[in-house]
Amino acid sequence: MLIIHPHWPPSNTVGVHRVRLIANELHHFGWKASVLTIDERDIEDDLSPELEKLVSPTVEVIKVRASPIKYMFGKRLYGDIGLRGFRALRNRARKLLKERTYDFIWFSIPSWYTPLMGPYLSKKLGVPYGVDYRDPWVYKLTNQQKGLNRASLTIALAHFLEPIAIKKAALLSGVSQGYLDGVISRNNTACKKVTFQMGFCKEDHLVNIPDFKPPFQKGKQSFVYAGAYSHNWAPLFRLFLQGLERLQRKQPVNHLEFIFIGTGNTELQSLTSIASELGISELVTEIPERIPFLHVQQCLRQANGAIVIGSTEPHYSASKLFQCLLTSKKLFAFFNSDSEAHYILQECTADRFYVPYNSAISTHDLILNIEDRVADFINPQAIWNPDLKPLAKHNSRANTEVFVKAVENVITNLG
């Protein structure tokens, strides 16, 4: 299988892990993984060399160089690695497909641009391809995003490019059925579809980095959120902080700290600013920049508890839920009650500190619910004893088995 993905360890982007987890497991099912990626010297994001330890030696990694970032009159035109590396990836893919025998080509998005080479490669070399959705390519803009701006341009471009990328795809996969339902309704495609969660490899979450110390204040109980902060999640973050403010007024909790890692988003009011506005700055520490994946795992292991705050949307798929269940002493969660993540919590009897979000619940009641759950969550005597056996069906090997069966069915049906 030829996997074309511009990010690969030591790149520290979120998208690395789904592709890595699948590639690592393919050999168990009789497949050889070749990953075609961009040389890390051309990656703008921070690098995490430790991540290379998590790549199976069975995975062949082929790297190409991307073109430099484009500027005009001192202004940055584009720097997206999927664009800068597109030609080099396509040319090397074409060469590999001519010289070797591959049975399938796989793209995982984002990056949004690499699947655009799928129709060309498939037609030219006769190899079927699939597109995997970790995030929706086309999505509904929030009221704050609407207007003549970059977000609207991005969505307009997505509406134009998505049909081109998937029109000849033999397989669509995704972390959520909701994502694929949207693709199908927009494009009226009849190709095979399969869903499987982000998944996890338990061993990833046990790696110790000896020279890293979590950013915890001495003498305080530390609770950690590590992940993104986006438009569809912003209302829930504010509600969480409002619930925390209410708790602080009734039951001072200055011996606690709530640390938010990787939540920088220039389009949104910062969590630091919201905490200041609510008068709870002493409780909230925001580290806007993402930190290396293995450092995050160490923070989660050593914290008094982990926090998962998600989207208002029902198709929300909490990839970070797995790492928190595997590593944390206890878990507070707040996201849509109809999401698959909620069902996973219930399966694992891990929902003691879960607050369900539903648009029918009033803001006042949500804040009260958060206050009550957080008060329970921070209680050292509160027992949280999840049953993790149900997670087995979501681990990386189980996911890869589901994926491989779908790929092999596609190949069989194509004859």
PLM region spans:
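N-terminal subdomain of nucleotide-sugar transferases
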Residues: M1-E60, L247, E408, T412-G415
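Conserved donor-binding/catalytic core segment of Leloir-type glycosyltransferases
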Residues: L2, P215-P235, L241, N399
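Membrane-proximal helix-turn-helix segments that form the acceptor-binding/catalytic region
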Residues: R87, Y113-L116, Y120-K124, W137-Y139, ...
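Carbohydrate-associated surface elements
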Residues: G178, M198-G199
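Acidic anion/phosphate-binding donor-loop and adjacent secondary structure
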Residues: I184, G199-K218
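Nucleotide-activated donor-binding/catalytic signature segment of Leloir-type glycosyltransferases, i.e.
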Residues: G262-T263, L268-H295
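A charged, aromatic-enriched C-terminal amphipathic alpha-helix characteristic of glycosyltransferases
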Residues: Y357-L368, D372-N409
